[in-house]
Design a protein with these regions (language model features):
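Short, low-complexity, polar/charged sequence segments that are solvent-exposed and flexible
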Residues: 9-12, 54-58, 79-84
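Glutamate identity and glutamate-enriched acidic tracts
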Residues: 9, 28, 52-55, 87, ...
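Alpha-helix boundary/interfacial micro-motifs
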Residues: 18-19, 28-29, 35, 55, ...
Length: 129
């Protein structure tokens, strides 16, 4: 429990809204989080008053799109944070199907986010690109 809170802080996450941890964009406080980290166990939040008693099989990192950064830029923040958390907590990175997240899975996520960014860019009016 408290190991998780310490690791989250070391990885640059802040405890906040909805009782979960967030990575906020540098200098853009009102823009919302780049991504967030929730408990895998329902309801997903962390009770900081009882964090030392927390036992959980894992956490999930997620981002809402559109967000304060382009999707691919946000992912380039999520991945090293997830890797740092796994290192600090002696954990493993898993994909959405709970399989090991390897190079191929990471490349697939990057491709999806790159396509999403392109779609968003092409949907903007010409003067806003």
């Amino acid at each position: 429990g408290s190991d998780l809170a310490v690791a989250a802080e070391k990885a640059g996450l802040e405890f906040g809204d909805r009782g979960i941890f967030h990575r906020m964009p540098a200098g853009e406080r009102g823009a919302g989080p780049v991504f967030s980290m929730a408990n895998m166990l329902k309801p997903g939040s962390f009770d900081m008053a009882r964090i030392e008693h927390l036992e959980t099989p894992g956490v999930t990192l997620f981002m809402a799109l559109p967000g304060p950064l382009p999707a691919l830029d946000a992912w380039d923040t999520v991945l090293p944070t997830a890797q740092r958390l796994a290192e600090l907590l002696d954990g493993n990175l898993l994909d959405e199907k709970r399989g090991a997240l390897g190079r191929q899975g990471i490349a697939h996520i990057r491709d999806q986010l790159r396509a999403w960014d392109r779609q968003q860019e092409s949907a903007k009016p010409r003067g806003m690109r």
